[in-house]
C-alpha cells in the first residue's frame, strides 16, 4: 500500500463549525474527515459550478473515495487551544418589521459566539492511505489545499511526500493522529470527540446532518495535539490495525473508510 503525507502550517488556526448547536456554535477541536475530504476536493472543483443543487464535493467523494483507505490529521505540538469570540452583532435583518423602528433600537443587536481553535504557526500533517497506485493524483490535490475549515482557516502546504505503508507489529506506538474510539481499550491522554465522517452535500430545505462517529484526539489538558504513546496491547486487534508510514503511525479500522463509504 502507498500513502501520501501532506505537511502544512496553520496561519492563525481554524474553525469547523459543529452542527446541531446554537447560532453561536462551537468548533471541532481538529478538522474531521469530512473537512479534509472537502479541502482535497478544491483542486478537482476549481472550475465546477453547482449542478442540480448538489455540491461538487459530493461528486468528488462519489468518484474518488474508493481510492482512499484512510484519512487522518495530527499536529506535532500540543498547542491547539479552542476558544470562542463573543461579538455583539446587528440582528436587524432577522427582526419583524414592527420591531425595526428606532423605538426598538435596543433589540437590534445580539451577542454571538464563534467557535475557533487557535494554533498560530502550528505544523500539521494529513495522512492519506491509498487503495490504488495513484499517489501522483492525490499529491497534486494535497498541494492545492488552501484552508482547513472555513475559508478564513488558511494554511500553507509546505511539502507532500509519497511513502510506503506497512502493517506494524511494534510494541510501542507513538502517534499524533486521531483514532477511531473503538480501536483502543484505554483512552488516557485522549479526548473522545463525535465528528462527521460522511456529510450531506445536497442543498435542501430539510435539515440533514450526515453520519457521525467517535474519535480519540490526543490531548494534554488544556491543549490539544502532540504525540501520544500507545501500547500494542491497548489496540483492539480484532477490529483495528496499526500501520506505519515512514516514521508515522496510524491506527484505524481493518476496513478503513469502507466502514462508511461503500466501494
Swiss-Prot record:
Misc. comment: The aCascade complex was purified from strain P1.
Known function: CRISPR (clustered regularly interspaced short palindromic repeat) is an adaptive immune system that provides protection against mobile genetic elements (viruses, transposable elements and conjugative plasmids). CRISPR clusters contain spacers, sequences complementary to antecedent mobile elements, and target invading nucleic acids. CRISPR clusters are transcribed and processed into CRISPR RNA (crRNA).
UniProt subunit comment: Part of the aCascade ribonucleoprotein complex, minimally composed of Csa2 and Cas5a, which binds crRNA. Other possible components of aCascade in strain P1 are Cas6b (SSO1437) and Csa5 (SSO1443), while SSO1399, Cas5b (SSO1400) and SSO1401 have sometimes been seen weakly associated. Csa2 is probably the major RNA-binding subunit. The Csa2-Cas5a-crRNA complex also binds target DNA homologous to crRNA, probably forming an R-loop. Purified aCascade forms a filament about 6 nm in width.
Gene3D superfamilies: 3.30.70.3120
Organism taxonomic ancestry: Archaea, Thermoproteota, Thermoprotei, Sulfolobales, Sulfolobaceae
Keyword field: Antiviral defense
Protein name listed in UniProt: CRISPR-associated protein Cas5 2
Biological process annotations from GO: defense response to virus
Protein's gene: cas5b
Keyword Cell membrane: no
Family: Belongs to the CRISPR-associated protein Cas5 family. Subtype I-A/Apern subfamily.
CDD domains for this protein: Cas5_I-A
InterPro entries to which the protein is assigned, alphabetical: CRISPR-assoc_prot_Cas5_N, CRISPR-assoc_prot_Cas5a-typ, CRISPR_Cas5_sf
Superkingdom, taxonomy of origin: Archaea
Amino acid at each position: 500500500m502507498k500513502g501520501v503525507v501532506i505537511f502544512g502550517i496553520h496561519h492563525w488556526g481554524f474553525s469547523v463549525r459543529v452542527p446541531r448547536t446554537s447560532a453561536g456554535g462551537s468548533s471541532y477541536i481538529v478538522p474531521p474527515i469530512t473537512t479534509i475530504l472537502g479541502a482535497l476536493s478544491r483542486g478537482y472543483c476549481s472550475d465546477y459550478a453547482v449542478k442540480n443543487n448538489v455540491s461538487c464535493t459530493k461528486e468528488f467523494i462519489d468518484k474518488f473515495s474508493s481510492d482512499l483507505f484512510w484519512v487522518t490529521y495530527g499536529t506535532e505540538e500540543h498547542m491547539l487551544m479552542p476558544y470562542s469570540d463573543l461579538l455583539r452583532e446587528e440582528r436587524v435583518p432577522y427582526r419583524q418589521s414592527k420591531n425595526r423602528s428606532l423605538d426598538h433600537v435596543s433589540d437590534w443587536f445580539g451577542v454571538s459566539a464563534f467557535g475557533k481553535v487557535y494554533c498560530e504557526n502550528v505544523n500539521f500533517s494529513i495522512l492519506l492511505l491509498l487503495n490504488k497506485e495513484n499517489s501522483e493524483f492525490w499529491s497534486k490535490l494535497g498541494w492545492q489545499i488552501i484552508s482547513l475549515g472555513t475559508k478564513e482557516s488558511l494554511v500553507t502546504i509546505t511539502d507532500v511526500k509519497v511513502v510506503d505503508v506497512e502493517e506494524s507489529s511494534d510494541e510501542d506506538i507513538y502517534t499524533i493522529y486521531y483514532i477511531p474510539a473503538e480501536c483502543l481499550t484505554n483512552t488516557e491522554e485522549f479526548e473522545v470527540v463525535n465528528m462527521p465522517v460522511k456529510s450531506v452535500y445536497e442543498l435542501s430545505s430539510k435539515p440533514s446532518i450526515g453520519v457521525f462517529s467517535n474519535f480519540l484526539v490526543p490531548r494534554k489538558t488544556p491543549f490539544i495535539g502532540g504525540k501520544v504513546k500507545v501500547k500494542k496491547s491497548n489496540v483492539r486487534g480484532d477490529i483495528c490495525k496499526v500501520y506505519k508510514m515512514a516514521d508515522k503511525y496510524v491506527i484505524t479500522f481493518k476496513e478503513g473508510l469502507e466502514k462508511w463509504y461503500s466501494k
